Regions:
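Hydrophobic alpha-helical transmembrane segments
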Residues: 1-132
């Protein structure tokens, strides 16, 4: 069985982009209520893949944490520490995306979005591999 499948990717895209309102998108990193409502609506398409409460709770909970606390930026910063010491940068020297401040904003935002999506897909894959 594949770890991440096309139906999981489709459920992720529908939940994270089609069902997410502008209010959820702009407020989820500032307010737990917005992040919680987004996490619940995000989880709805996964009802087509599983009815297992543990899988759905894991998908919802990890989505809440990743989005509310922008966990992808820490992953980005950590991966960029795997460089020679003269290239690495301290957390205070990073932008809100986790990249160095001299990286063009358009690039750092898109790379953060990609990292965020990969984190979600990995968490969903774990949940559905264990509890599907």
């Amino acid at each position: 069985m594949a770890f991440i499948t096309a139906d999981q990717i489709l459920a992720h895209l529908v939940g994270d982009y089609i069902l997410q309102s502008h209010w959820m998108a702009t407020e989820k990193t500032k307010r737990s209520l917005a992040a919680g409502i987004h996490a619940v609506t995000y989880t709805l398409p996964f009802l087509y893949l599983t009815l297992n409460p543990a899988a759905l709770a894991f998908i919802c909970g990890t989505h809440f944490a990743i989005d509310r606390f922008r966990l992808a930026r820490f992953v980005v910063w950590l991966k960029n520490q795997q460089t020679p010491s003269r290239v690495g940068y301290a957390w205070p020297d990073s932008s809100a995306t986790g990249y160095p401040k001299d990286v063009p904003p358009w690039l750092s935002v898109w790379l953060l979005i990609i990292a965020d999506n990969i984190l979600h897909l990995i968490c969903n894959g774990i949940a559905l591999s264990i509890w599907r």
